[in-house]
């Protein structure tokens, strides 16, 4: 619950 919240853009961890 910090980087990818509610599918906000495709983040690459």
Curated annotation (Swiss-Prot):
Keywords: Pyrrolidone carboxylic acid, Secreted, Vasoactive. Disulfide bonds: none annotated. It comes from Rana temporaria (European common frog). Smooth muscle-contracting peptide. GO terms for cellular component: extracellular region. Its main location: secreted. This is Neurotensin. It is found in: Secreted. GO terms for biological process: blood vessel diameter maintenance. Belongs to the neurotensin family. Identified in brain, intestine, and rectum, but not in stomach or skin. The modification Pyrrolidone carboxylic acid is found at residue 1.
